[in-house]
Amino acid sequence: MKILVSVRSVEEALLAARGGVDFIDLKEPSGGALGGLPVATIRSIVEALREHGNGVAGKLKTSATIGDVPMTDADRIAACVDAVGACGVDYVKVGIERVSQALAVLDMLARTAWPVVPVFIADRGLDAVHVAHACSLGFPGLMADTADKRAGSLFDAVGAPELKRFVATVRGSGKMVGVAGALRLENCALLSELAPDFAGFRTAVCDGDRTTALDPRRLQALVALMRGGAAMRGGAVVEAG
């Protein structure tokens, strides 16, 4: 399991990079579950990480969200994907709600020129048909996340059996699979049992709620705990919650 941490600025990105995470996810926490950053900010962060020596050409990977765009506005989703992808991130994350438009949006995303990772918003559960359809398309990976971070973690929103089926289905299709959603240090044991390829964190590494600044001590504690569990299980963890 690899570790993903969500950041909103160059300063936070460099802190996370120096802290030893595997993925740096670019988002605006105050803008919702997948709040998007301005394109100029995304580009600045990518350039700063390259200068730091951990850019997209290195081991450290970057992702960025397009923002909470309504699923009914496919044209806007496509335009946002193009704008974010052109900033040089490794992956473009797009939220997938449990709505009737999901299949058509997934088809559209699979035709873009960018490596898109659909993020299934799991507050009302995971739609097996939507997940299976995404697995049949050319995405590099899929994620499960939550929208309402105040309602608890992903494990409060979705039962363990359903999450295990999600991980097994995505992994069985040959894609990487990740989870996020207000994950905290106390969720690490459940993450170890679930064993996704990566887990995403924001809440766990902030000095307060997820909209406050990253706390270097909390980041260090998360990495130490996740690496310890990884060493025993032969894996590592990530957060984007």
Region locations from a protein language model:
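Hydrophobic faces of well-ordered beta-strands that scaffold small-molecule active sites
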Residues: I3-V7, I24-L26, L60-D68, V92-V94, ...
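Catalytic cores of alpha/beta
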Residues: R8-G19, V69-A86, G125-A134, V179, ...
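Glycine-rich phosphate-binding active-site loops on the catalytic face of alpha/beta enzymes
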Residues: F23-L34, A86-V99, M143-A151, L194-L219
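Glycine/small-residue-rich loop that forms an oxyanion/phosphate-binding "nest" at active or ligand-binding sites
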Residues: G35-A104
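Charged helix-capping and loop-helix junction motifs
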Residues: L37-I42, R76-V81, A128-H133, D156-R165, ...
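C-terminal helical cap(s) of enzyme catalytic domains, especially alpha/beta-barrels
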Residues: A40-I45, A102-V105, F201-G241
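Hydrophobic, well-structured mid-protein blocks that either form specific transmembrane helices
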Residues: V84-L137
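Histidine/lysine/aspartate-rich catalytic loop segments that bind and position anionic ligands
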Residues: I121-E162, T169
